[in-house]
Design a protein with these regions (language model features):
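Membrane-contacting alpha-helices and adjoining membrane-interface segments
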Residues: 3-80, 117-133
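Soluble accessory domains appended to multi-pass membrane transport proteins
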Residues: 78-134
């Protein structure tokens, strides 16, 4: 039994780390801006109670309207964490056979054998065959 990492493992791990780092950076930036804005408004004497209540209502409305987007992003996060496939892997997904060219949080692009570039929402990927993983 050979447990050594295969060729390209370091590049694949670096790509995953870069993507996950980008997600965490975006989340942290959003949190910092929201907290800073709330603190500045509080210093100017604004009553933040109604603002927070309104933000909650807007959050529910946006959440209901963006269910597909949220599903795609969550699927992308789990796909990255579970390392289901990566750039350069040969995959069969939906009715497409080809090579993964880009993996994003929302969309994965696959170059089909006939040369067509397919953009697949991560939330649509229910089953996937990865010929590159042994």
């Amino acid at each position: 039994l050979d447990l050594r990492p295969g060729p390209g493992t370091a590049h694949r791990q670096a790509e995953r780390a870069r993507t996950i780092g980008s997600v965490l950076t975006s989340i942290l930036n959003a949190v910092v801006w929201i907290v800073a804005t709330a603190m500045v408004l509080g210093e100017f004497g604004f009553n933040l109670g109604p603002v927070i209540a309104s933000a909650g209502i807007v959050g529910v409305a946006v959440g209901l309207g963006a269910q597909t987007l949220v599903r795609d992003i969550l699927s992308g996060i789990f796909m990255l964490i579970e390392d289901q496939y990566g750039v350069g892997d040969r995959v069969d997904v939906l009715t497409i056979s080809g090579v993964v060219e880009r993996v994003g949080l929302r969309i994965t692009t696959v170059r089909a054998d006939n040369g067509t570039l397919w953009y697949i929402r991560n939330g649509e990927i229910l089953t996937l065959g990865n010929a590159s993983k042994k």
